[in-house]
């Protein structure tokens, strides 16, 4: 999980979602998991 000021999808399978007011990227490649904060 990377915590970044701005999250962007890295590959085609990355999905940008909102959980509890936080913007997150989930992907089947676990290296692409990101959270804004």
From Swiss-Prot:
Keyword flag Ribonucleoprotein: yes
Keywords: Ribonucleoprotein, Ribosomal protein
Molecular function, one GO term: structural constituent of ribosome
One cellular component (GO) term of this entry: cytoplasm
SUPFAM superfamilies (alphabetical): Ribosomal protein L36 (SSF57840)
Pfam families, A to Z: Ribosomal_L36
InterPro entries: Ribosomal_bL36, Ribosomal_bL36_sp
Gene Ontology BP, a term: translation
HAMAP family linked to this entry: Ribosomal_bL36
Record-stated family: Belongs to the bacterial ribosomal protein bL36 family.
Protein name from the UniProt record: Large ribosomal subunit protein bL36
Species assigned in the record: Beutenbergia cavernae (strain ATCC BAA-8 / DSM 12333 / CCUG 43141 / JCM 11478 / NBRC 16432 / NCIMB 13614 / HKI 0122)
């Amino acid at each position: 999980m990377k915590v970044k000021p701005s999250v962007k999808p890295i590959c085609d399978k990355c999905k940008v979602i909102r959980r509890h007011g936080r913007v997150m990227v989930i992907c089947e490649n676990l290296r692409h998991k990101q959270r804004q904060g």
